[in-house]
Amino acid sequence: VNESGELKELLKKADFSLSMGKRSGKNNLYLFNSIEYTKHINKLYLREKLRDSVKENFKGFEMYYQPVVDASKLSSCSNKVDGVKVIGAEALLRWSCPEFGLLGADQIVPILEESGLIAPVGRWILIKTFTQCKMWNEYNKRFHMSVNLSYMQFERSDIVLDVQMALEKSGVNPENVILEITESGYIDHVELQKILDEFHAMKIRVDIDDFGTGYSNLRYIQNLHANTLKLDYSFVHKAVLDKGGESERKVIEYIINMAHDLGMNVCLEGVESESDVEILAPLKADKYQGYLFGKPMSPYAFIDENRKFIVDE
């Protein structure tokens, strides 16, 4: 074995296997897996690169924006794309890595959460997106911006102070800001309620993202004073299937009706074709989001694609 290279690599692999064995419980044998080891090494590499990016004034981090449209404007249109009314955007994190290219939030947020970097990056996201919203509100005062919050931001930073600072630095109208949280994973619900009450006192709306993937009931969500339920795209994908979609559509319709009765709106995510709209229109959702109306894009591309909606009618 070559001391300078192969031995060190062998020890790394042995340490990895030992760590994986401990994770699986006491007295368990873990057989080395090269694929899992490669993922582990890549993760460590990305963690260090992300840490460097944060130190270098968030170099490589970008925000992309996906249109959110008014579903009520589409039900009577023969051409669903031409009849679309973009009313806002969801801000989505991206990070440009020389070795791996442009990475999405699902690839980097878990690493940011585990490493503790989510607190500074989260503050950067709030300021960046609030400022972008302020710029677009110069042309359309009603245009809103949705920003995702990680549950770790509630635990590793003073999230209320972070939001207040972003509001002050950007000068955005808080009524045009929507903070998105998921159903589960947060600190105790009493503390969460207090924090959300402070957001509402600032006139900031709160949406529940990926609704249906957790175990919350609508009454609990109502107690959080949520503005909109965003149904997970998996619901929509099942609902538009030729076979088996009818039962899923009934579930979606039930959720929409209940949400409306409780004073909440519903956004359907993952709408990808005009046929999807035709199938979903009778369910009476309030908003749609999906590739039919636009993929996540840079702010410049978003302006080019949606200029007529950024400018007030």
Identify the meaning behind each predicted range:
Residues 13-14, 147, 221:
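Alpha-helical scaffolding flanking metal-ion-dependent phosphate/phosphodiester catalytic sites
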Residues 23, 58, 139, 169-174, ...:
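Alpha-helix termination/capping residues and helix-transition junctions
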Residues 10-17, 49, 91, 107, ...:
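Structural preference for long, well-ordered alpha-helical segments in enzyme cores
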